A protein has these predicted regions:
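General N-terminal leader/first-domain-start detector
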Residues: 1-42, 47-52
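N-terminal regulatory/effector-sensing and dimerization cores
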Residues: 30-138
Length: 138
């Protein structure tokens, strides 16, 4: 499963709905509308083959929300412009202005996001095909 398909599957199972592109987001990626029952806002993702993806979160939850996601193997780096919550494995606070990273593919990413606080972030995930093969070949 490719990067784009992974996020499309996870987001739609979580209630997000793919929507038309907006002038606020690059049309090269896919834009998803948050599930209206639990959140308000958008999730944008652009995947480049099996090399990397770029994600933008811009939504908030109506209630404190627990997220559990088994990511493919990758190095994930995210800057949070706005957030309030906790990463659970290992425990770390999520606060505005922080940069968080994790190495995915081994255990589920688990976090709690607090209600009515915007989750605004930009992240990149770099996959083994990029840092083990693509860069070496260049």
């Amino acid at each position: 499963m490719g990067i784009s398909e992974f996020y499309e599957d996870w987001l739609t199972r979580s209630g997000f709905v793919e929507t038309k592109s907006s002038p606020s987001y690059c049309p090269a990626g896919k834009l998803y509308l948050a599930p209206k029952e639990v959140a308000c806002g958008y999730y944008w993702v652009y995947g480049e083959k099996n090399l990397f993806d770029i994600k933008i979160h811009d939504f908030y939850f109506f209630e404190d929300s627990f997220i559990s996601l088994n990511t493919p193997e990758c190095l994930s780096i995210t800057y949070y412009d706005s957030v309030s919550g906790e990463e659970l494995t290992p425990y770390r606070r999520l606060t505005a202005g922080c940069v968080k990273s994790f190495y995915g593919g081994h255990e589920a990413y688990k976090a709690i996001f607090h209600k009515n606080i915007p989750v605004r972030s930009v992240g990149i995930e770099v996959f083994p095909a990029y840092y083990e093969n693509y860069l070496r070949e260049r």
